[in-house]
Amino acid sequence: MNRWQKIGIGIAIAIVVVVALGFWAQARMRSFFYPVAPPMPAVVSEPMPEILARLESILKTNAPQVLAGLQPGLSAGDIAKLEQQYQVQLPDDIRAVYQWHDGARSSTNYVGDDFIPIHRFVPLEEMLAEKAAQGKGQATLLQRAAYRIFAGQRDSWFCLFSDGVRDGYWFDPKRKPSEGAVFYTFTEDNTFVFFPSAKNLMAGIAKCYEQGAFRVKPGPAPPQLDEDFEKAGKIWEEFGASNQPQ
């Protein structure tokens, strides 16, 4: 074997090592930015339609302004057409949520935009269109590589309740429910709250409104939503599990 062959083999080995380290680093980063759920509470036994009917009743009594800001639900046929158009299959519980109400109307009224404090219920077609447009803009090779490492895990996420700055409540059709396919994120401190089912998420919201953890502030015009974080935190522990130690 001559000198140049040895150099070529050395370069090839170096490339393989660098690529392997790159894949390892990407996997490690993804597990950090998108962890598997810790042990979660049991799935709520109540059927989703009953949970949503109860939530509707609670909103009518405790937060009528929030209920007034929601759009009418979609038919099963409407949802099927959108699934076909955007080539996605929604989980059954998510379909049920959009048959209940198709998100919140866009409004300058604070409560009119928000379904829960600081989070808007995104209409289905808007959510699917935003997901379809994601990543279609021009980007350099370096920008695309950085995205794959730091945010590529979001490719399969769909935002149900959005805070408008890339955090909120999501579902991931590519994850199993036992892995935490429904979850809340707060990127600033890498907090996740995982739910074993969308039923747990909606039941938790119903309880937050029922017990005053979510409420409409008395007095301000336009009305604003408020959150009792201590009370809400205890409620969420009944329905989901955080990746952060308490």
Listing of model-derived features with the role each one plays in the protein:
Residues 28-165, 216, 239-246:
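A surface-exposed partner-binding patch
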Residues 178-186:
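Intrinsically disordered, low-complexity regulatory segments enriched in Ser/Thr/Pro
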Residues 1-15:
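N-terminal Sec-pathway targeting helices
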Residues 191-212:
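Compact, glycine/acidic-enriched structural inserts
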Residues 11-29:
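N-terminal type II signal-anchor transmembrane helix
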Residues 210, 217-223, 233:
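Mixed-charge (acidic/basic) macromolecular-recognition segments
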Residues 223-246:
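Low-complexity, Gly/Ser/Thr/Pro-rich intrinsically disordered linker/tail segments
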Residues 167-174:
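Short, surface-exposed beta-strand/loop micro-motifs that present aromatic residues
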